[in-house]
Structures are given as C-alpha cells and as structure tokens.
Amino acid sequence: MASSQQAVRETGRGRASSSSAGGRKVTFGYHLVEGKTPHGMEDLHVAEFRRLDDGNEDGGDGGSTAVTAILINGETLAVANVGDSRAVAFDVRAGRAQQLSVDHEPLRERDAIEHCGGFVTEIHGDVPRVDAQLATSRAFGDRQIKEHISSDPNVTIEDVGGRRRRWWHGARRPRQRRGVEECFLQRLAEYAICIHGASMEHRNFHVHSSHVHYFEIPPFKEV
C-alpha cells in the first residue's frame, strides 16, 4: 500500500476517496483504509459488491439484484442490498413487518442516472425504467447500461440486542415454526401491497414459503 504512493481522505459515512501516482481515483477507499473508516461494515459491503460486479466482465449480458445480512455477536445486524431485493423483519409478538433494505427505483435516483448520461422512461401501464430497460436503478451486470447504473449497496445497521424477532432469509422451516409461517406470509403480502400501492390489490399476489428463508435471532442475555 505504501509503495503505490496513494493518498486517502475520508468523506464521511464510511466512504473515502483516493488518488494515486497514476491518476486513477478510487471511491469508497475499501482497498486502502481496510475498515478503519467510521463505518467499517459499509466499506466491507461496498468492497464485496463492487468486487463481484467487477468480476462480471467476461460474463453474459444478464443482471441481478441481491440482499445480504450479517449478524454480529447476536446483537448487530448489517443488511446490504442492491436493486429491489428485500430484507424484511417480522416481529412475531407485535405481528408487524419492518423492511430493512432500500428499494433502488429509477425515479428516486433519476438525477444520478441522468448525470451519468442515462434517462428514465415513464410509460403508462409500465414501471419506470432506466434507458427504457431496467426497472431498478442499481444492479449487478446489465453491461449494456452499466455506465448509467450502480452496484453500490445501501447498508442498514440494526441493533437487535434484547429483542426477539423472526428474521426470514430462506432455509427449510422447522416444524415448530409452521404455526407462525402463514401469519408471516400474509403480513408480507399485505406489506408488499402497502408498499407498491393499490394497483397490486387487483393482482393474484401470493408469497410462497419456498421464496422465503428463515432464521431466528435468540433473545439477548445479560451476564
């Protein structure tokens, strides 16, 4: 790192920019600061998401969205997502769903898309799209419009210490959870309708258990 004669400056929110003798600029500084910025989990997620996207140069023209969740010491949950893949927490006792991810929609990020030379289409009967193609403003792949979209994730840090929740992420369900599964799926369907608006009420919307992964965060125990 020292031999490359690179200078790093922090820009806040766990991000950094750098300049090198070769004139190449690196944003988010994850190759250089090695987690020393105030938000190390953000740097980690950005680094991994970008590394994955950069490794797609020899791949096809397809694309994908993604969501990840890292549980730290049973107390802190770091959720990162690109596109419209979602992480939703379901509070069993309260019967309430909480979205932990951020939907990356073209209209929300129109300024950034247009700044990169792209455009957002709004056609009646269809969702807004980037360059009349992609329905999300961030994604992996999609090389044909790569210059107009981003693969940088939104990172949410959630304190889960002392609370008991059901976190759905997609493994086989144990028998003891079957009683709450139907309740969760119903709430998740209602949540999706609420987020997307009344237009979904006219669709045959259903969330199947095979689409959902599950794990439980145990209650925090004081010592």
UniProtKB/Swiss-Prot annotation:
Domain PPM-type phosphatase, residue spans: 1-212
Cited PANTHER family: PROTEIN PHOSPHATASE (PTHR47992)
InterPro entries in the record: PP2C, PPM-type-like_dom_sf, PPM-type_phosphatase-like_dom
Pfam families found in the cross-reference section: PP2C (PF00481)
Reaction(s) this enzyme catalyzes, per UniProt: O-phospho-L-seryl-[protein] + H2O = L-seryl-[protein] + phosphate; O-phospho-L-threonyl-[protein] + H2O = L-threonyl-[protein] + phosphate
CDD domains on file: PP2Cc
GO terms of biological process kind: regulation of intracellular signal transduction
Gene Ontology molecular function: any one: protein serine/threonine phosphatase activity
Family: Belongs to the PP2C family.
Keywords tagged on the record: Hydrolase, Protein phosphatase
EC numbers, comma separated: 3.1.3.16
Official protein name in the record: Putative protein phosphatase 2C 63
UniProt signal peptide: none
UniProt region (Disordered), positions on chain: 1-22
Presence of the UniProt keyword Transmembrane helix in the record: no
